[in-house]
Design a protein with these regions (language model features):
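An aromatic/glycine/proline-enriched structural segment found at the starts
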Residues: 1-26
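M16 family metallopeptidases and their MPP-like homologs
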Residues: 1, 26-48, 53-163, 177
Length: 177
């Protein structure tokens, strides 16, 4: 009711959590919250996608039993998600997710590969635009206290990604997970 405010504690989530439900979908997710890791920048996002392409998907989908897997990020909420679907090997999937940062450090990534991951990061970071979409997005961000400046800095920094950033990205992703 309006007279009994909800305690803030119901809105907090544990740092690490996982849930497994016996269903046909069997979706597994691990979320990395980079909101409190100031060193994590837009230039590190393409390396998340490289880890998904060169480590997570081969380990979970092709060698495991999952239907699909990947990595998504949501800049306004400052987190990324490693996910798999129709995955019955929950324990090994979570172990694979947890080691993504360590594995990324030694992945072979060419300049050409990195350019593709940079484009993919832009595609995921830039929401649809239009006359109403932009205004509604601004209002939602303002309402929820989301910094448009921070999001724009992350997006602008994607293009600064270089192979020199791979080791730092790996260490930060490992720290976040």
């Amino acid at each position: 009711t309006e007279d009994a405010p909800l305690p803030d504690s119901i809105f907090t989530c544990p740092r690490r959590s996982a849930a497994a439900i016996d269903s046909p979908l069997e979706e597994v997710r691990m979320t990395g919250d980079f909101g409190n890791v100031s060193e994590f920048m837009g230039r590190h996002l393409p390396f998340l996608l490289a880890a998904a392409d060169k480590y997570i998907k081969p380990a979970i989908r092709y060698q495991g039993c999952a239907y699909d897997s990947g990595v998504d990020f949501l800049l306004p909420n400052r987190y990324f998600t490693l996910w798999s679907t129709s995955d019955s090997r929950i324990r090994s999937t979570l172990e694979t997710f947890a080691s993504a940062g360590e594995q990324l450090e030694n992945l072979a990534i060419s300049e050409e590969d990195l350019r593709g991951y940079i484009l993919s990061a832009y595609a995921q970071a830039l929401p649809p635009s239009g006359m109403l979409n932009g205004r509604m997005r601004f209002l939602r961000r303002r309402l929820f206290g989301i910094s448009t400046d921070h999001i724009n800095k992350m997006i602008m920094d994607i293009r600064n990604s270089s192979l020199k950033d791979q080791r730092t990205a790996a260490k930060l992703i490992h720290k976040i997970l």
